[in-house]
UniProtKB/Swiss-Prot annotation:
Gene3D superfamilies in alphabetical order: Ribosomal protein L14
Family statement: Belongs to the universal ribosomal protein uL14 family.
Subunit-structure text: Part of the 50S ribosomal subunit. Forms a cluster with proteins L3 and L19. In the 70S ribosome, L14 and L19 interact and together make contacts with the 16S rRNA in bridges B5 and B8.
Gene name for this UniProt entry: rplN
Descriptive protein name: Large ribosomal subunit protein uL14
Function as written in the Swiss-Prot or TrEMBL entry: Binds to 23S rRNA. Forms part of two intersubunit bridges in the 70S ribosome.
Species assigned in the record: Sulfurihydrogenibium sp. (strain YO3AOP1)
Membrane-spanning segments: none
HAMAP family: Ribosomal_uL14
Taxonomic path: Bacteria, Pseudomonadati, Aquificota, Aquificia, Aquificales
Any GO BP annotation: translation
Pfam families: Ribosomal_L14
Keywords carried by this UniProt record: Ribonucleoprotein, Ribosomal protein, RNA-binding, rRNA-binding
Source domain of life: Bacteria
A single Gene Ontology CC term: cytosolic large ribosomal subunit
């Protein structure tokens, strides 16, 4: 469960290390984002040689959350951290690698490229 102001790790090799959520599209009633939601983030810390630069604003998709995600079969899945993958304007990943596991819900939301690059899908 991600809200405005939440700090998140990046799960790709775009160069950003830490980002902050600054917007959740969906109107005034959309207060929280969960796995598979696209949010607006700003880069808070980045490596100097990376594509993503500190202070820039990007779209990102949430791939892991500490808050558990309910599955239709009654099971729950949660991760150790909150993580996102940075996206370009066409909603494609900026990085070429995905680090760590991603949730299976991304496949049903249409992020096939992220699921195929991920080392593990939970």
């Amino acid at each position: 469960m991600i809200q405005r102001g939440t700090y998140l790790n990046t799960a790709d090799n775009s160069g950003a290390k830490l980002v902050q959520c600054i917007g959740i599209p969906g109107g005034a009633k959309k207060m929280h984002a969960t796995v598979g939601d696209v949010i607006t983030v700003t880069v808070k810390s980045a490596i100097p040689s990376g594509t993503a630069k500190k202070g820039k604003v990007y779209k990102a998709v949430v791939v892991r959350t500490k808050k558990e995600v309910a599955r239709p079969d009654g099971s729950y899945v949660k991760a150790d951290d909150n993580a996102v993958v940075l996206l370009n304007n066409q909603l494609e990943p900026i990085g070429t690698r995905i680090l760590g596991p991603v949730c299976r819900e991304l496949r049903s939301k249409g992020f096939y490229r992220i699921v195929s690059l991920a080392p593990e899908v939970i």
